[in-house]
């Protein structure tokens, strides 16, 4: 009798169960481990972010804070659209709230990347667009570099990646210093998101190119 092969959704569910039971860095987490992700094998958009904040740790819902409100506004998505896991996957670089350091949250713990990230990415075959939100995600995927030029030169990384600043309260100050973000980047971001959600349906609806161009940067392993 042949062994039954696990389907990709079953494999993802089994792996997520292991992730949510992980205690590899429990000793370093002031509020204890609570991995917070939103993943489905059908998702076409992946948000690679930093790490949950303290409010998100309490709710267990990714981006259930002011940063999430700002990110959804940038993306042009309603809360219902954003939390539709069949379309939008959310996987931070660190899955748990890392605590505080200096004037803000501590950097995401590195254990999640080493233990889980590649395994999870392999089970997200439908992803067309990955949003790299903040410096930690950008450096992991793209290598060393500054956030602002990567955001401004977003076309260099399409159609696979789209770099964004972290949507914390500090991003308002950053936006005031960089007015091209709302003028040039956000319209292109929203167009890229609709293309990732609907594929050729959006293109055939009569929409223009919105400055996205057709030649994307070769994919970088990760996601």
Please give the residue ranges for each predicted region.
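Short, intrinsically disordered C-terminal tails of secreted or membrane-associated proteins
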Residues: 218-221
